[in-house]
Amino acid sequence: MANGKYAARKLKQDRQQRRWSDSEYARRERGLGAKSDPLEGAPQGRGIVLEKVGIEAKQPNSAIRKCVRVQLIKNGKQVTAFCPGDGAISFIDEHDEVTIAGIGGAKGRAMGDLSGVNYKVEKVNGVSLIELVRGNAEKPVR
């Protein structure tokens, strides 16, 4: 490793080469996060509900979290989205159009005891899921 009086160029060159060993740097520079993102960088996305699924929570919790499999309209990719709220799953039926957004986990990934679920349902047929759960709104008949 160069460390003399005129070694700045060599030091900079070495640093640039070694940065590629850092996986976060390499992913960021290659744009791999955007390539693998089902929403393609958008904050929200619309999709059609394919099925309701119950996903078991990770240890030490013991619960079946109510989720839905959603096929996105923009690119046909399938994702699993969590349905927040007590009894929220009862307001969602197959073939409903839902709006999903990121669930808000660390580094844009899964949250809490739900592994592999990176999204949550925000709207059902254009109506807020929270409003439906509270009873402030009714689901429109399609």
Swiss-Prot record:
Keyword Ribonucleoprotein: yes
Keywords: Ribonucleoprotein, Ribosomal protein, RNA-binding, rRNA-binding
Record flagged with keyword Ribosomal protein: yes
Basic and acidic residues composition bias: residue spans: 11-32
Region: Disordered, residue numbers: 1-44
SUPFAM superfamilies, sorted: Nucleic acid-binding proteins (SSF50249)
Domain of life assignment: Archaea
GO CC field: small ribosomal subunit
Stored InterPro entries: NA-bd_OB-fold, Ribosomal_uS12, Ribosomal_uS12_arc, Ribosomal_uS12_euk/arc
Record-level Gene Ontology MF annotations: rRNA binding; structural constituent of ribosome
Function as written in the Swiss-Prot or TrEMBL entry: With S4 and S5 plays an important role in translational accuracy. Located at the interface of the 30S and 50S subunits.
Family the entry assigns: Belongs to the universal ribosomal protein uS12 family.
Protein name, UniProt field: Small ribosomal subunit protein uS12
Gene it is expressed from: rps12
